[in-house]
Amino acid sequence: MPTLNQLIRHGREEKRRTDRTRALDKCPQKLGACPRVSTRTPKKPNSAPRKIAKVRLSNRHDIFAHIPGEGHNSQEHSQVLIRGGRVKDSPGVKSHCIRGVKDLMGIPGRRSGRSKYGAEKPKSI
């Protein structure tokens, strides 16, 4: 613990908050290309394989991004748009791919939560 004299001379140092999405450079989204698309097993107690893409962003950062939803058409050299948001059971995955933008298709036939998965409005009968 500092003495009163030390506090008068130097003061207290403010704690710096760590930036969770440093790769995005304070942008809401970033564009990138996928050098690799794979699956990864999550932490205990979960077990379903998570679809993961390694993405080289336009600012030369390499990150892992989660591909949400059921099924995807992403492959090597696909262009994807990235947003923040971690995947709780996958260590090191701190961002998501945005469906329905660039080469990553939306989910066809999805009715609920369409805006999150880039799905088109279904035709009314």
From Swiss-Prot:
Disulfide bonds: none
Compartments where located: Mitochondrion
GO BP terms: translation
Domain of life of the organism encoding this protein: Eukaryota
Annotated Pfam families: Ribosom_S12_S23
Record field: compositional bias (Basic and acidic residues): 10-23
Record's GO cellular component terms: mitochondrion; small ribosomal subunit
Residue numbers spanned by region Disordered: 1-23, 104-125
A GO MF label: structural constituent of ribosome
Keyword field contains Mitochondrion: yes
Keywords: Mitochondrion, Ribonucleoprotein, Ribosomal protein
InterPro entries: NA-bd_OB-fold, Ribosomal_uS12, Ribosomal_uS12_bac
NCBIfam families named among the record's database cross-references: rpsL_bact
Protein family according to the UniProt entry: Belongs to the universal ribosomal protein uS12 family.
Biological function: Protein S12 is involved in the translation initiation step.
Annotated protein name in UniProt: Small ribosomal subunit protein uS12m
Organism: Raphanus sativus (Radish)
Recorded name of the encoding gene: RPS12
